[in-house]
Amino acid sequence: MSGARRHRLRRELGSIGIALVLAWAPCLAAADDDQPPSAGEPDNPFYALDTKNLFGFLEGADVGEKGDRSLEFETTGSFGEAEGLYRSIEQEFIFEPTLTDSLGMEFGAHVLGQDVQRVPGLPDFAGVNFMGASVEFRYVVIHRTAEAPIQVTLTAEPEWNSIAEAGQSAADFSTTFRAVADVVSSDRRLYGAVNLAYAPDGARLPGQPLQDTSILSASAALSWRFTPPLMFGAEADYDRAYGGLVPREFDGQAVYLGPTFHYQVNEKIDLSAAFLVQAPAGRLDFDQFPRELAKLRLEVQF
């Protein structure tokens, strides 16, 4: 890639970073003025946490309380292909209202920055583009209680994208259907979650026929609170790629393993992150799935 193109990419990614800092700074500054969340019981400093963002790439089952509103800034990185250089960073800006104690929604706008060089089947590209938009519906079907600390939530997330890999124009429509279950220990120190997902996708590049694909995935995570605001954990994801909206022709699979992190800054602000690496499960598949995945998320309630 030429020096001019690299400079342009750094400038565009830098502009995104500056915008994020400006957006986050007032929220983080407000952390000094807010009181930390209070414990549920006088003898237990481990107060209740919203589980939705505790588990890295997995989702927790909480949707919040009626009337809650929040903004999320979610950065997802994908790195590495079988050959060449592949780096992709997606920035999502999310508005999340809770309509009832059982129903929540998310409205997202997506920006994509990519640096792709010498990857077979893809043109060389470096740049940043507006990618698309999404809506997520979250509905709790089984609520957590003191007697049964398990919660189950069903989600559906339709998404439209106008940009494909390597900056190619596309008309891409997908929907991710997810079953989410999580459990919290009685002392609120150990958290676990399981996600099952089905994601059909239909995409058309200019001058090419419609391509129908789908992904089935199963994920699990465990997290432990070392202090009331600080949590570390581990995540395992198993993904299978197929041709067809209804899984038909098997195209590849990947197992990802890695650590997760969550920090409750104060009652209204939390920060979470995860880093996953494709682990040996037979042959490593870098054709359908990247080598590494990373996520950083900031949520601000208001």
Predicted regions, residues:
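Cleavable N-terminal export/targeting peptides
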Residues: M1-Y47
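Transmembrane beta-barrel domains of Gram-negative outer membranes and organellar outer membranes
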Residues: A31-F302
